[in-house]
């Protein structure tokens, strides 16, 4: 079995080399029709577009993307060509929730927001959105949920309309997949009409897909004061991001909200397990990320502990200083562990 692997997928080399006869590692942008021609499987990230132009005439039978999102895979073509594909749903949901929690603490520290007096609207309540809701409730924030597909499927009254969330929420965070058309279209879900309906002084957060928010409408809302702040991890036209938007946001990061070592290990494990199931290979290889250098966090408050474990301002400062290095900052992302890897002692 021959497998082509994105060379930035962590913790995969030893495991995949026990499974496959031949493994080739390349940057995600360098997958070509010639390269995949005689491959049996691909393990990719979002930077590799898997469609007819890449796959036509190849031997590829299976594609695993080590990501939650799969809009970079032409699923209709794969179905037509008999190619099985899989993603890694929920792999980095705790990582994104960690990012959002830290961002909320930063807003409280630097903007004087009292989180226990705020209302947050969570748009998209899947694996990630559900964990973000848990975090918000733990911090004493009132939560409103919006998820049209779930609302219709479950016939539930727990969900609010997007209009209601826009009018009532102090903070709105997006956790939806990108659908460019159809009944549940999310492309430019936050457009100028959405921003004009917002509660004045609201904060927007986006860790889903850049195209969910219309960039020019977001910029105008920031310029006019409709929005007080924005936390942006995903951007339209990545890696060629809007520099004015980067300058205006309180936190702007290079699509790394889900990049904890724990989330990456989950994604790699899920991709390998799916590969083994498809090709009927037995393996018991375990993937564990490296331990943090200092496992003991001792400080006066949980807020301080959370920001000692992960402070997104470090990633934001790096991107604002070097916006042209978007891809490099993603690809060379340093070790970041989630809260469960530490022993936290609150001394106050």
From Swiss-Prot:
User: Does this UniProt record's set of keywords contain ATP-binding?
Assistant: no
GO cellular component terms, A-Z? cytosol
Q: Which terms are listed as keywords in the entry?
A: Cytoplasm, NAD, Oxidoreductase, Pyridoxine biosynthesis
Quote the subcellular location field of this record. Answer: Cytoplasm
The chemistry this enzyme catalyses reads:
4-phospho-D-erythronate + NAD(+) = (R)-3-hydroxy-2-oxo-4-phosphooxybutanoate + NADH + H(+)
GO annotation (BP), single: pyridoxine biosynthetic process
Kindly list the positions annotated as binding substrate. Answer: 46, 67, 259
Q: Which HAMAP family match?
A: PdxB (MF_01825)
Job of this protein: Catalyzes the oxidation of erythronate-4-phosphate to 3-hydroxy-2-oxo-4-phosphonooxybutanoate.
Check the record and name the PANTHER family matching this protein.
2-HYDROXYACID DEHYDROGENASE-RELATED, GLYOXYLATE_HYDROXYPYRUVATE REDUCTASE B
Q: Which family does it belong to?
A: Belongs to the D-isomer specific 2-hydroxyacid dehydrogenase family. PdxB subfamily.
Protein's name in the database: Erythronate-4-phosphate dehydrogenase
């Amino acid at each position: 079995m021959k497998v082509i692997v994105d060379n930035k997928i962590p913790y995969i080399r030893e495991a995949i080399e026990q499974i496959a006869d031949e493994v080739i590692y390349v940057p995600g942008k360098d997958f070509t029709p010639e390269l995949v021609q005689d491959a049996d499987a691909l393990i990719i990230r979002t930077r590799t577009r898997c469609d007819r132009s890449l796959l036509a005439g190849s031997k590829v039978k299976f594609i695993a993307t080590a990501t939650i999102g799969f809009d970079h895979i032409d699923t209709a073509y794969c179905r037509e060509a008999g190619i099985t594909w899989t993603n890694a749903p929920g792999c980095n949901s705790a990582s994104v929730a960690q990012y959002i929690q830290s961002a909320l603490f930063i807003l409280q520290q630097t903007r004087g927001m009292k989180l226990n007096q705020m209302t947050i609207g969570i748009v998209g309540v899947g694996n990630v959105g559900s964990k973000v809701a848990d975090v918000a409730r733990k911090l004493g924030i009132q939560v409103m949920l919006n998820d049209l597909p779930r609302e219709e499927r479950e016939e539930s009254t727990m969900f609010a309309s997007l209009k209601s969330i826009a009018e009532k929420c102090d903070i709105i965070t997006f956790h939806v997949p990108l659908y460019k058309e159809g009944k549940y279209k999310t492309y430019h879900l936050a457009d100028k009409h959405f921003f004009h309906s917002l509660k004045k002084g609201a904060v927007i957060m986006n860790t889903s897909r850049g195209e969910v928010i219309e960039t020019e409408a977001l910029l105008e809302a920031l310029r006019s004061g409709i929005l007080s702040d924005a936390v942006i991890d995903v951007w339209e036209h990545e890696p060629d991001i809007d520099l004015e938007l980067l300058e205006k946001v309180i936190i702007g990061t290079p699509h790394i909200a889900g990049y904890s070592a724990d989330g990456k290990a989950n994604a790699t494990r899920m991709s390998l397990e799916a590969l083994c199931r498809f090709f009927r290979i037995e393996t018991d290889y375990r993937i564990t990320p490296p331990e943090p250098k200092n496992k003991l966090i001792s400080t006066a408050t949980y807020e301080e502990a959370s920001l000692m474990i992960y402070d997104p301002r470090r990633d934001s400062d790096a991107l604002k200083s070097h916006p042209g290095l978007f891809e490099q900052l993603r690809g060379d992302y340093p070790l970041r562990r989630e809260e469960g890897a530490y022993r936290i002692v609150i001394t106050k």
